[in-house]
């Protein structure tokens, strides 16, 4: 889908946003050329972009308000990204209805990227095509098509803009990280670190990204986004059991999160990161309002929905958790870390004795990332409950090969996933018996 891609583009760009105050900018008047020095080629600012008015392919004046609304909302959403420089709506609309080359627009407005698209409505169906273009080279960096039932146009407009924004965040960061830089600054290293985190997680990738964020902080100790991303990474490394020094990582993550919030109290990323640190400290009840605040500040922050859903689950609100995971998956279906979201949906369904749905989600998670031990363990229980002992035993062996936590049921039962009495009762009726049938020892 088109919007997830676009959203991806801007998500990575988000790293740059934190160091560079976002603002709308109008084209600047050229300065008088000096006759005493050679003229240097103009280089557009990083993360500078114009959202061109989307084309109304049906040529129906009655639909112009919807088409223009998409353009205006995207302009507003992208401008919230710290570090972005978004051309103001009034300037962008001077290109409405005109066929102008993206490279020419880049020169005229001084931007690196052009987002363009079209909307066609037929009856109750709406098709939206969008693409991100490198204004310096004319290359297409990302494109996607979005087909939806018109239904509530206002809700559709919100959905579309959120998904595009999310996609653009990642794509812009990736694009910026690939540009050669003679003298990299803090922002360059932040973008490089963000680009690394768009790939499937591993100990090596965490280490690589951490090194880049550390370099950014060394260059600029006041870089809010560098502090925030490093804190998020340290907390995630602990949660994913990929930290050699978990206590030290958590203590430092806590300090960095506090630093980021002090420097930028209205930062969606900073609130999300504080939630991540609290989650890593097994303080889900305190993390929930931080995730909710992050979402209120940035409705496209898909990981915040997923983590909020997981905290709802861990605190006993099992039914309430599902819509948050569904929204996260809907906003960012190509998220690099989407496998745990699929897996936790499977966990919830298994605990609800919905084995077929559970296995479906767990297999989706496994196809995205085959190294998640909890996914294999829940698959073992699911297949055992379905009467497939051979597959159940195979999945249990996979889980045991990935984590020592699955060599006895007593060890599994110690997980903080089952601290809540409601969750433990559900597990005792479904998951634990399934593991027994799969062959896990009691002790």
How does the language model describe each region?
Residues 169, 173, 198, 401-404, ...:
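Generic surface-pattern signal
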Residues 377, 394-397, 429:
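A generic structural signal for well-ordered alpha-helical surface patches
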Residues 178-180, 243, 340, 405-423:
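Acidic, Ser/Thr-rich low-complexity linear motifs
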Residues 2, 6-7, 11-357, 361-386, ...:
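Acidic, proline/glycine-rich low-complexity intrinsically disordered segments
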């Amino acid at each position: 889908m088109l919007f997830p891609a676009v959203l991806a583009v801007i998500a990575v760009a988000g790293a740059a946003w934190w160091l560079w105050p976002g603002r709308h900018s109008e084209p600047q008047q050229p300065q008088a050329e000096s006759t005493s020095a050679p003229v240097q080629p103009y280089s557009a600012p990083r993360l500078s972009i114009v959202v061109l008015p989307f084309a109304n392919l049906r040529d129906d004046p009655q639909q112009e308000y919807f088409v223009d609304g998409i353009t205006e909302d995207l302009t507003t959403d992208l401008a919230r990204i710290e570090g972005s420089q978004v051309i103001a709506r009034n300037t962008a609309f001077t290109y409405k209805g005109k066929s102008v080359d993206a490279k020419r627009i880049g020169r005229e407005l001084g931007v690196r990227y052009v987002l363009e698209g079209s909307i066609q409505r037929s009856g109750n169906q709406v098709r939206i095509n969008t693409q991100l273009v490198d204004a310096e080279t004319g290359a297409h960096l990302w494109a996607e098509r979005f087909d939806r039932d018109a239904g509530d146009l206002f809700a559709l407009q919100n959905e579309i803009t959120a998904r595009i924004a999310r996609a653009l965040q990642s794509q812009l960061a990736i694009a910026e990280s690939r540009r050669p830089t003679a003298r990299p600054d803090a922002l360059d290293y932040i973008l490089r670190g963000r680009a690394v985190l768009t790939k499937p997680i591993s100990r090596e990738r965490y280490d690589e990204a951490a090194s880049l964020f550390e370099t950014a902080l060394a260059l600029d100790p006041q870089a809010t986004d560098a502090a925030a991303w490093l804190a998020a990474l340290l907390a995630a490394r602990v949660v994913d059991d990929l930290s050699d020094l978990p206590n030290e990582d958590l203590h430092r993550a806590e300090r960095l999160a506090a630093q980021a919030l002090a420097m930028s109290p209205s930062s969606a990323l900073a609130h999300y990161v504080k939630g991540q640190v609290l989650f890593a400290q097994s303080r889900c009840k305190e993390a929930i309002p931080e995730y909710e605040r992050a979402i209120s500040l940035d409705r496209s922050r898909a990981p915040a929905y997923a983590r909020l859903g997981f905290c709802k689950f861990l605190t006993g609100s099992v039914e309430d958790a599902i819509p948050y995971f569904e929204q996260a998956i809907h906003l960012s279906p190509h998220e690099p870390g989407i496998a745990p979201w699929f897996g936790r949906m499977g966990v919830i369904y298994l605990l609800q004795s919905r084995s077929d749905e559970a296995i479906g989600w767990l297999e989706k998670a496994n196809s995205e990332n085959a190294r998640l031990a909890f996914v294999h363990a829940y698959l073992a229980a699911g297949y055992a409950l379905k009467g497939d002992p051979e597959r159940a035993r195979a999945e249990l062996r996979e889980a045991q090969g990935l984590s020592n936590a699955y060599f006895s049921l007593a060890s599994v039962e110690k997980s903080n996933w089952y601290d809540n009495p409601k969750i433990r009762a559900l597990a005792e009726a479904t998951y634990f018996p399934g593991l027994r049938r799969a062959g896990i020892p009691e002790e």
